[in-house]
């Protein structure tokens, strides 16, 4: 794991569940706000306002501050055609019940997907399995991988287009309203009876080349009202 210094105190975004100010990262200061967990053979770099992940065996890049619901995460991302077009994935509201600090020494995560089995988190695998599936799961920290049929999308309109900049939006409220939206279309809309009210956001991929830009975190404009 590469832990990178959180240098910008004024960029603290969540206090008592609400954004003090909208936070955005144009990556002009590099990857100072991010923590990288990656298997050997890959790299994470920043250039021209873009966070670039070139991966071989598995990579998660975490936004360092903890998020507290209600929260909206927005970013733009694409999968490059110069690599394997698959796995534009993300965790949000992720936490490890064994430790209050996700990044405390001894967490054991190394970029391999199995090393994340202890997390409680919302997860979308967008264009997974060689770009044949897009799935939402709520992991419970036991290693189980539950999948509701309505959260398993296989139609072409839900899969990745190479080199296309997607606008991704993630929502989580304290009441359990959870959404994953892409290009202003809600793909998954969930009411969680046991909400994950705090945790971390991470971008994930494996054996692909992805780019991320225009990252932001804020509160919803108004309280979300269920599904």
Spans of features found by a protein language model:
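Enrichment for repetitive, rod-forming helical segments
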Residues: 9-10, 184
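Hydrophobic h-region of N-terminal signal peptides that target proteins for export
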Residues: 10-19
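Extracellular glycan-recognition regions
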Residues: 18-227
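Bacterial N-terminal signal peptides that target proteins for export
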Residues: 1-8
């Amino acid at each position: 794991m590469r832990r990178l210094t959180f240098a910008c105190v004024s960029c603290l975004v969540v206090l008592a569940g609400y954004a003090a100010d909208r936070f955005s990262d144009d990556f002009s200061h590099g990857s100072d706000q991010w923590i990288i967990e990656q298997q050997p053979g890959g790299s994470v770099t920043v250039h021209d306002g873009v966070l670039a992940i070139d991966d071989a065996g598995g990579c998660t890049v975490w936004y360092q501050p903890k998020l507290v619901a209600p929260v909206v995460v927005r970013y733009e991302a694409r999968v490059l055609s110069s690599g394997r077009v698959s796995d534009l994935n993300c965790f949000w509201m992720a936490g490890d019940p064994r430790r209050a600090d996700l990044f405390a020494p001894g967490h054991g995560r190394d970029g391999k997907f199995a090393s994340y089995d202890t997390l409680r988190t919302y997860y979308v695998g967008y264009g997974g399995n060689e770009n044949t599936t897009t799935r939402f799961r709520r992991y419970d920290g036991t290693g189980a991988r539950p999948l509701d049929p309505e959260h398993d999308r296989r139609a072409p309109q839900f899969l990745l287009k190479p080199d296309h900049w997607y606008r991704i939006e993630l929502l989580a409220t304290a009441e359990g309203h959870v959404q994953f939206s892409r290009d202003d279309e809600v793909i998954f809309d969930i009411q969680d009876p046991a909400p994950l009210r705090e945790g971390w956001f991470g971008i994930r991929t494996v054996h692909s080349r992805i780019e991320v830009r225009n990252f932001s975190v804020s509160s919803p404009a108004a309280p979300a009202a269920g599904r």
